């Protein structure tokens, strides 16, 4: 094994990372620093401290990263109206660069020469964690136990835990049949019956949202205030970024908004089925496009739409800390200088319906757009020359006998 003196482990306190902790201590004979991130996953993170202490860990980091997560990662991503493969709002992907950043910061603070994570060798997360780590600390060692050990089943992990007296919960609570990941932006569900792409997901799988059929029969109206492309208030009440997203999750969930069942293309080459709940993000995406519709120049809006799939792919595949993502982010952020105003939405049985938008920076001119008499604001005769000039190349081709049918 490589010479490792101290390693920072991304630690949840669950079975997998608890086994990894002991495995690192025994296999590398090194000191382990644990790092547990609170990203709004809705679980108690403090029990991870007690478990780490019981296993002899002396340096334990438990960080509340909810505000940083939404402010510096989720909000910048939504300024681009980011969607991967037409549907996925990147709830898992966008959390990984922050975890990688904090792993490296802690490594620098503690003098650690390595980091470790619990991502498997089949998934995208190993790539996301490690690309971020290498970008931020080129010489760091990365230990990925799932690519090294032979503990490739839950049974083997349990046996290892029992053999080494690793504290694990043994109560009667039924284990979820799905592999789940959660943060303030979403919950994901994979594995189990979802590995059959024809099998419908079960209703009791969903944790944040009611079914649209069981959502309230009365719609709810909601006003979102934007400043430079970010939401700063709901119904006139100013909120921090994390509070905005948490509130939208609650409201959206009550109305059955944000459920998704997709098959996506993983970076490592395979297709994977995932179900996602992203109520707040679904609302944010619809509202942001609405406020941009009146504040962005047409060509800027179209260019953003052309660049968005590339930007989404960079996030999905782990290139958040790459120079190309940073370049695109500067362009996206520059486009948001005038994205200010208020969007009014109607939430009803899984639907997010835009019912109004207004802004002091609006480019919508009712005097020009009206179907009524415009008082000379727009000379319709000008359209003839505009059309002829734009048709010129096609007329030339037709005159040359180039058939189009």
From Swiss-Prot:
Keywords: Amino-acid biosynthesis, Arginine biosynthesis, ATP-binding, Cytoplasm, Ligase, Nucleotide-binding. The keyword Phosphoprotein does not apply. GO terms for molecular function: argininosuccinate synthase activity; ATP binding. Disulfide bonds: none annotated. Gene3D superfamilies: Argininosuccinate synthetase, chain A, domain 2, HUPs, Single helix bin. L-citrulline binds at residues 88, 93, 124, 128, 179, 188, 264, 276. GO terms for cellular component: cytoplasm. Belongs to the argininosuccinate synthase family. Type 1 subfamily. Its EC number is 6.3.4.5. ATP binds at residues 10-18, 37, 118. Homotetramer. It catalyses: L-citrulline + L-aspartate + ATP = 2-(N(omega)-L-arginino)succinate + AMP + diphosphate + H(+). This is Argininosuccinate synthase. L-aspartate binds at residues 120, 124-125. It is found in: Cytoplasm. GO terms for biological process: argininosuccinate metabolic process; L-arginine biosynthetic process; urea cycle.
């Amino acid at each position: 094994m490589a010479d490792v003196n101290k390693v920072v482990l991304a630690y949840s306190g669950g079975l997998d990372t608890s086994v990894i902790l002991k495995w690192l201590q025994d296999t590398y004979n090194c000191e382990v620093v644990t790092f547990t991130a609170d990203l709004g996953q809705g679980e108690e993170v403090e029990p991870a401290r007690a478990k780490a202490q019981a296993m002899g860990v002396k340096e334990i980091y438990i960080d509340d990263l909810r505000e940083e997560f939404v402010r510096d990662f989720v909000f910048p991503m939504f300024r681009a109206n980011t969607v991967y493969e037409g549907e996925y709002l990147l709830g898992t992907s966008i959390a990984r660069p922050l975890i990688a950043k904090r792993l490296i910061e802690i490594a620098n603070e503690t003098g650690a020469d390595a980091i470790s994570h619990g991502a498997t060798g089949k998934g995208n997360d190993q790539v996301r964690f490690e690309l971020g780590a290498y970008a931020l600390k080129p010489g760091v060692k990365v230990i990925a136990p799932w690519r090294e050990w032979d503990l490739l089943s839950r049974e083997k992990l349990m046996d290892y835990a029992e053999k080494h007296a690793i504290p694990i919960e043994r109560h009667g609570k039924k284990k979820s049949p799905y592999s789940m990941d959660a943060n303030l932006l979403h919950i994901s569900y994979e594995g189990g019956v979802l590995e059959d792409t024809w099998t419908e997901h079960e209703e009791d799988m969903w944790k944040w949202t009611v079914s649209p059929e069981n959502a309230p029969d009365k719609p709810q109206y909601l006003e979102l205030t934007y400043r430079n492309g970010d939401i700063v208030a709901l119904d006139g009440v100013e909120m921090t970024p994390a509070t905005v997203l948490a509130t939208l999750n609650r409201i959206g969930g009550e109305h059955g908004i944000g459920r998704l069942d997709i098959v996506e293309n993983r970076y490592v080459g395979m297709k994977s089925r995932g179900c996602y709940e992203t109520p707040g993000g679904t609302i944010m995406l619809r509202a942001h496009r609405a406020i941009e519709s009146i504040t962005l120049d047409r060509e800027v809006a179209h260019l953003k739409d052309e660049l968005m799939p590339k930007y989404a792919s960079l996030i999905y595949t782990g290139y958040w800390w790459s120079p190309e993502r940073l370049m695109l982010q500067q362009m996206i952020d520059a486009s948001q200088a005038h994205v200010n105003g208020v969007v009014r939405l109607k939430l009803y049985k899984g639907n997010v319906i835009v019912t109004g938008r207004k802004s002091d920076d609006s480019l919508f001119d009712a005097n020009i757009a009206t179907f009524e008499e415009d008082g000379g604001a727009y000379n319709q005769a000008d359209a003839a020359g505009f059309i002829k000039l734009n048709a010129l190349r096609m007329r030339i081709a037709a005159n040359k006998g180039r058939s189009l049918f």
